[in-house]
Amino acid sequence: MFNKPARIGLPSPDHQDNYYWAVKGSNALTFWIALNSSDKNNGCVHYYDGSHKFGILEHEASFAKGSSQKISDTNFLKKFKTSYPKLEAGDVLIHHSLVVHGSSKNISKNNRRGWTIQFKDKNASYDLEHIKNYEKSLNKQIQLRV
């Protein structure tokens, strides 16, 4: 569950889900289910339209609570239109595992909660080398925090 409490919910850095999942072929989707209404003020998910067409982008440590990675080249993202879908409780967003997305902090008096379910192609496999490199990156971040 993704929880952004009223007035204190933290931002989620821009990222691609498949950077975490490492699904070969990237045939994977996220279903984001709104548990209450969501808009720009309470930190709705935002999307960079068309960003999924460029494969997995370089990520780096974000050092953000609850999110370990972020897109490295933020200038690259400036070429895309950013969408801020407004949702009501029960609405569902479906996005591809390569689409760049994130969310801003919650500055409103309303909580923003969402539940996600991920699906992948039944023939999908995992990129074990990517997983190994990601684990190394996580270990470096942990060492820097100690």
What do the PLM-derived regions correspond to, one by one?
Residues M1-A6:
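Active-site cores enriched in adjacent His and Asp/Glu residues with nearby glycine-rich loops
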Residues R7-I8, N106:
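Short Asp/Glu-rich motifs
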Residues G9-Y84, A124-I131:
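Catalytic core of non-heme Fe(II) oxygenases with the double-stranded beta-helix
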Residues E58-F63, A89-I94, L98-V146:
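Non-heme Fe(II)/2-oxoglutarate
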